[in-house]
């Protein structure tokens, strides 16, 4: 055994393994388009009023298959805007039955025009503008939220 594998280090390896096993997976959204394979999106969670108000403001880039998931305490008509947001986004409104009820496509950066869900929604997913068109995502598609830590109400 080389000097870099001291007995002390070997004692900590099981602890390191246990910590790694207990780490929670990255939150993600799975979208099931009516035509095509499931789409996996890694998400940041906006689950407080402060996080929901700030959203993706001031972000200059967003990797493909990444987004922000907004969690609301109840299902109701939601409205978004693009104030201080330099990226065009697709805003996907999802109801409590995990069905897409509306999509605001290729939103205009920095616009203060309200973009309402039109129908009650409890979750909202923001992804890059054009994402829904590129991946065939439509109103009526189903969604799953595995590994999403829901806040306690």
Language-model features: locations:
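Compact, glycine-rich, soluble single-domain proteins
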Residues: 22-153
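C-terminal motif of bacterial Sec signal peptides marking the signal peptidase cleavage site
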Residues: 18-20
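Bacterial N-terminal signal peptides that target proteins for export
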Residues: 1-10
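Residue-level signal for mature regions of secreted extracellular proteins and peptides
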Residues: 14-15
């Amino acid at each position: 055994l080389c000097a870099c594998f001291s007995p002390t280090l070997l004692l900590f390896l099981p602890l390191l393994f246990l910590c790694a096993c207990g780490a929670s997976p990255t939150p993600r959204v799975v979208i099931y388009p009516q035509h095509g394979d499931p789409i996996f999106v890694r998400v940041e969670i906006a689950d407080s009023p402060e996080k929901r108000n700030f959203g993706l403001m001031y972000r200059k880039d967003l990797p493909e298959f990444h987004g922000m998931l907004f969690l609301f305490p109840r299902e109701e008509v939601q409205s978004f805007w693009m104030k201080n947001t330099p990226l065009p986004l697709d805003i996907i409104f999802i109801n409590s039955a995990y069905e897409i009820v509306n999509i605001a496509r290729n939103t205009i950066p920095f616009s203060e025009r309200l973009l309402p869900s039109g129908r009650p929604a409890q979750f909202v997913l923001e992804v890059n503008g054009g994402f829904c068109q590129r991946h065939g995502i439509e109103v009526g598609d189903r969604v799953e939220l595995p590994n999403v830590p829901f806040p306690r109400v």
